[in-house]
């Protein structure tokens, strides 16, 4: 148990273009070394490219892509006796969103395209179409949870 008190969650300011907290969270995840202006440029260019390619609204593309990435269940380690079991559990909404954004940026960075703008745009399009690395990761997490269903009664 933590010895210190509860740390309150910080409020996230909505971004200036789409007035969305979700966009700010994605930009913050893209940001490296505090370079927020660069992260914003990367995100806005990528979302414009992706929405132009799909012929949809930018926010529709982002929300659709994240919906296809966010996991519903995951496994968590639980020690019972001398054994450690992977217990499948439902994912809280805040964590679902956080994991979705994390995987989106992580798999965009791992892609082979030349610039981060192209990588992120391609990953957004892939995620929107239910393909790509981030969606594979979600499916893998779901498979793990399905495989460990017999241990579901160890929930806490």
From Swiss-Prot:
- Answer yes or no on keyword Nucleotide-binding: no
Mention one GO molecular function: tRNA binding
Provide the alphabetized UniProt keywords: Ribonucleoprotein, Ribosomal protein, RNA-binding, rRNA-binding, tRNA-binding
Q: Which GO terms describe its biological process?
A: translation
Q: Which GO terms describe its cellular component?
A: small ribosomal subunit
- Identify its protein family: Belongs to the universal ribosomal protein uS7 family.
Subunit annotation: Part of the 30S ribosomal subunit. Contacts proteins S9 and S11.
Under NCBIfam families, the record lists: rpsG_bact
Q: What does this protein do?
A: One of the primary rRNA binding proteins, it binds directly to 16S rRNA where it nucleates assembly of the head domain of the 30S subunit. Is located at the subunit interface close to the decoding center, probably blocks exit of the E-site tRNA.
* Record's protein name: Small ribosomal subunit protein uS7
Q: Name the gene that codes for it.
A: rpsG
